C-alpha cells in the first residue's frame, strides 16, 4: 500500500456553502478482488460530513466495482464506467464520526492494481445533485450541473502519461502500476453551473474510464 507524493497536502475550498477538502490518495500494487485500504484519513469529523471516494483499477477482463464501504458505512454509487482494461467509479457516504478508518473496494473479479482518492464535504446535501461517467474516449467527457455554492469531484483511471483537467483542479496523480495512472480533481462553485464541460485530456489514449459527481449545499 502506498500514498502518492504528488499534490498530497489536504486542501479546503468553499464557495460560501459546501466546504470541500481533498484529503488523500492511496494505491495498492497487488492483484486482488477486494482491496482494503486501512486507516485512511477522513479529515475532521463533523455532523453530516460526506466522504467521497473515487476508485479505479486496471483489468484484464471487464470488471465493475461491486461495492465500497467507508469506515464500515456502505457507500452510494454516484457513477461508474467500465471497459475491458479498466474501471472507475465515484461513491459517497455520510460518515459523521471518526478521523480515519478503512475503505474497502470490492470488484466483480480480480483486478490488476487499484487506487482511491478521498475528499470530505461539510455543509453539503446528503444526496448527490448530478452524476456522470464516460469511457473509451479522449478526452474523457464528464459534463456536470452544479448548484450555486456547490462542489464537484471527479476521477479517472487510464494509461496516459499525463492528465489535463478542464474546469476542475487536479488534486492527485498516482501510479498503482507503472503503466496505469489514476487521477482526481475537484472544485467549488459560487454560481450555478449547467452541464459544465468537465473533461480530462490524456497524453495517450487507452483504458480510459472516468466518473464525477456534484453536491449542493444543505
Predicted regions and their residues:
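Primarily extracytoplasmic/secreted proteins
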Residues: 6-218
Amino acid at each position: 500500500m502506498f500514498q502518492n507524493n504528488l499534490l498530497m497536502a489536504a486542501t479546503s475550498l468553499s464557495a460560501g456553502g459546501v466546504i470541500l477538502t481533498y484529503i488523500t490518495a492511496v494505491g495498492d500494487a497487488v492483484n486482488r478482488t477486494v482491496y482494503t485500504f486501512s486507516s485512511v484519513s477522513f479529515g475532521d469529523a463533523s455532523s453530516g460530513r460526506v466522504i467521497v471516494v473515487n476508485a479505479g483499477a486496471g483489468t484484464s477482463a471487464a470488471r465493475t466495482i461491486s461495492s465500497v464501504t467507508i469506515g464500515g458505512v456502505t457507500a452510494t454509487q454516484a457513477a461508474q464506467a467500465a471497459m475491458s482494461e479498466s474501471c472507475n467509479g465515484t461513491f459517497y457516504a455520510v460518515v459523521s464520526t471518526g478521523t480515519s478508518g478503512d475503505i474497502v473496494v470490492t470488484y466483480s473479479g480480480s483486478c490488476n492494481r487499484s487506487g482511491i482518492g478521498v475528499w470530505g464535504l461539510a455543509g453539503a446535501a446528503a444526496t448527490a445533485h448530478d452524476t456522470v461517467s464516460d469511457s473509451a474516449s479522449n478526452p474523457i467527457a464528464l459534463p456536470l450541473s452544479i448548484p450555486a455554492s456547490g462542489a464537484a469531484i471527479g476521477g479517472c483511471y487510464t494509461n496516459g502519461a499525463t492528465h489535463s483537467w478542464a474546469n476542475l483542479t487536479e488534486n492527485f496523480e498516482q501510479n498503482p502500476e507503472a503503466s496505469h495512472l489514476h487521477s482526481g480533481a475537484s472544485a467549488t462553485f459560487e454560481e450555478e453551473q449547467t452541464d459544465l464541460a468537465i473533461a480530462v485530456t490524456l497524453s495517450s489514449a487507452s483504458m480510459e474510464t472516468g466518473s464525477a459527481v456534484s453536491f449542493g449545499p444543505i
